[in-house]
């Protein structure tokens, strides 16, 4: 596996017989594996282990964010890092470091190895996560471990990703033998099970008291007073916070959108917080929250969520542009959110920030949006399939299930639900366009606009369409409070109407832009900045 120029010629290493002296055997192993490994890899692992032992956050973060990806690109672009036995020999089999190393090892295999991980590697990765979480959760006292927040976020995010990836792997029966299916369904039925994932994430939330801490912050109370012995440590506190976001993602992947928003209740998702300093976490949170709102038909909240985070991405690109893999991931998620935003704006037209409108124009979203407004269901479908999460089923196929590919079943179910909602609304843009032209309009005249050969039955059906318009344009909209599920019903349409006998009375409720307030705020901000500059002594 590790042959080639990077590791030199290893032909002269033969299997050796144990001497019977544990000290001599360990020394021999250390020399044996050290000579197989490139010097820069060996020194990196030794220094990485030492930094984690000493809790040197600056060095850990530098090696995690910079050195590890650089060595991966140079030595292990399409191959795995050295295995546990090789690494253990040069770090004195440090238990904590080896668990953390294997987390990176299996993550690298998922990301870089052509064809993806084998079943055994997927199972071993799961048990390694179990070892890590048992180490920090089952301990009677807090584990004194310091890791950078970016690593903690990516650890939780990767944990959920590998669950999702395994669920899809498990659902694809067409490329598996009967022995593999037997292993999956009988011998390893609990590996990467949904109950294990939820149990771990909820345990991290509970042990950190993160919900109590967030509630204390919202009430102006010192969170340390309710944090407990574990939650006082930044390591546990941030793991608890990131686990809330992990639960949001898991419930979204399962199609449980109410619970996805519910689990975030301590977090005021429409406000910035001290915990939102990891761009990838903030972007992922907004993506899943916005998608959940869209599927719950809360389009105004979805539009606000997508618009806010897309503005944030525009303004903070330099924070993550140095890390190419993170940049690619964020760019892809941003592209997905532009697609979802376009869908929401078609179903629920409203004003958004001009810079977001500019991007929609530059990337030709307006052409697709026009087709959707004209009732082109295929465009709705293609936008949804591109932008939705890769849904999974909580239940694996049975051992005696037909040899088919079940991966797409969860996504097709969610697509069916979404398209059913779209079909109910596909005629509303046409109705809206006619109503905007009049202040009063007879029902018969509107029916003739829609269908020149309209009959009495068509007029009756028009009443149903107008009632549908009223219903669909009234959405629950969040206004304040920590719960993203709360809100008040508001009409999202730029017009309102009522029907008196056979006459439709229409009122334009569009609020004109108040540019004066915008310029006053900017002038005041500029004057304040000018005063501060004058007070600076150079």
UniProtKB/Swiss-Prot annotation:
It comes from Drosophila mojavensis (Fruit fly). Residues 305-513 form the PCI domain. Its main location: cytoplasm. This is Eukaryotic translation initiation factor 3 subunit L. InterPro entries: eIF3l, PCI_dom, TPR-like_helical_dom_sf. PANTHER family: EUKARYOTIC TRANSLATION INITIATION FACTOR 3 (PTHR13242), EUKARYOTIC TRANSLATION INITIATION FACTOR 3 SUBUNIT L (PTHR13242:SF0). Keywords: Cytoplasm, Initiation factor, Protein biosynthesis. It comes from the Eukaryota. One of its GO terms (biological process) is formation of cytoplasmic translation initiation complex. It is found in: Cytoplasm.
